[in-house]
Structures are given as structure tokens and as C-alpha cells.
Amino acid sequence: MKKITFIGTGYVGLVSGAAISDFGHRVICADISKEKIRQLNNGSVPIYEPGLTELLKKNISAGRLNFTYDIKKAIRDSEIIFIAVGTPEGKDGKSDITAVKSVAKVIGENINEYKVICTKSTVPVGTGNLIKSIIKEHNFNNVPFDYVSNPEFLREGSAVKDFLWPDRIVIGSENKKSLNIMKEVYDPLYINDKPILSTSIATAEMIKYAANAFLALKISYINEVANLCETLGADVQDLSLIHISEPTRRIE
């Protein structure tokens, strides 16, 4: 059983934190918003996702899942820290990683023993190096740590199912120590015989963007097919069932 903190209680942080606590780990979900933490502690879930409310209640009752706005203490009390804050698109079309950088600074200032720092947020390739440098800059006692990237592949409407029954888990790491620690986090998924795919940090960061781009490509494809069907008098519903029902062509 690991002691884990998720910084950020938005869509990714809340779903991931609840699901990982269901694996048997002790999880703290931390956020700077006192109001959001108050609501969560009172049983109010700020987002709707099928199965999430039940998952939260189950693990809160079991004592495995807690919420706090004391991010500094949550960092000190954990072995693994997941960065799960938002990275919204800015006016220039680029991801705004201001919150990620702020979290890295707080981690550096409060790291008190060896920890694994893991990014769940979708971040541009190369952000891992920036996070490491910020932590080191503020880690005045030179406490050792490892950094890993563990991108999420959650779909709205089936996020809980996607996390508990994934088709793969991607971990980007720099050494076996941090990789093995992350494998222990996902140990229960071995029961489902799901592969843990190990790669470099940069590749893990890129995989998320590649997956998003491929999804956009598939959606564009079926839209073009639908337009052709309308022009030619073909039935796009039947076509979808026949042609895209084959797993390698499925729109997901």
C-alpha cells in the first residue's frame, strides 16, 4: 500500500485519485480551493461521471481517500505525488502550464524525503525537464526524487471504467526504481491482464498528443464518410455498424 497525493481535484485528479484509492492505496486529493475541498468533504461531487460518486463514497468510508487544502502537508506525508492540475489552452493555442510550474515549486519547497513525482496532466513534450529543474531549484536540502510521466486516456462519460479497466498503462521513467514503484501503484490491474508499457519521459508525454490527434483523425474520417453517404444515398448508420465495428477501425 502506497501513500499517494494528487494535487488538483479537477476531472483528472478526482477520477484518478478515487480509482487509485480503490486499489487499496491511501490517497490524499489536495487543492488550493478551500471551497472545493469543503464540498468534497461534505459529500458533494463537483463533476458528474458515471460511477464516480459511488467510488468516492466507498473509499472515503474505507478511510483510504481524504481531501485537503493543505498541499504542503500532503506533499510531506506522501511517497508519490501526482500533478493533476489543469493545463488550459491559451489564446496562442499553447497549453498554459502556469499551475504545473507553481505545483513544482511547492513540491521543491516541501520535499522531505525521497519521493516519486508523477505528472498526470496533459503537458507539452519537454515539460518533465522543466518540472525537474524547478523542483531542484527550490529543493534546498537536495532531497532525492525521481520524476515520471503517466498520461491519462480518460473519456468523458466512461472515465471511471477507463481507469479501472484500461487497455494500457503508459509510464515514462528514467530508472528502474521509479518504474517499479509506479508498477506497484497499478498492481491490481495485473488481475485484468493489462499491459504496463514502459518508455522514456518524452515519449510518454508525446503519446498523449498522438492519441488525441489520432482520435481527431478518426472523427474527421467518419464525418467525411457521412457526407459522402448523404450525397450518394447510402446509410451511414449501417456503414458504421458494418465497417467500423471491426476493433482496429472503431471510433473511440
Where in the sequence are the language-model features?
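NAD(P)+-binding Rossmann beta1-loop-alpha1 motif at the extreme N-terminus of oxidoreductases
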Residues: M1-S44
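A structured beta-alpha segment of the ubiquitous adenosine-cofactor-binding alpha/beta core
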Residues: L52-E79, E89, G108
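A short helix-to-beta-strand connector/capping loop
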Residues: L56-N66, N141-F145, N192-K194
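Alpha-helix C-terminal capping/helix-to-coil transition sites in glycosyltransferase folds
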Residues: R76-D77, E113, P166
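Glycine-rich, N-terminal phosphate-binding loop of Rossmann-like dinucleotide-binding domains
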Residues: I83-V85, S121, S173-E174
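Rossmann-like NAD(P)(H) cofactor-binding subdomain of soluble oxidoreductases
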Residues: P88-F153
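Conserved Rossmann-fold dehydrogenase catalytic segment
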Residues: V148-A216, D238-L241
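Single conserved hydrophobic/aromatic residue that forms the stacking wall/gate
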Residues: I242-E252
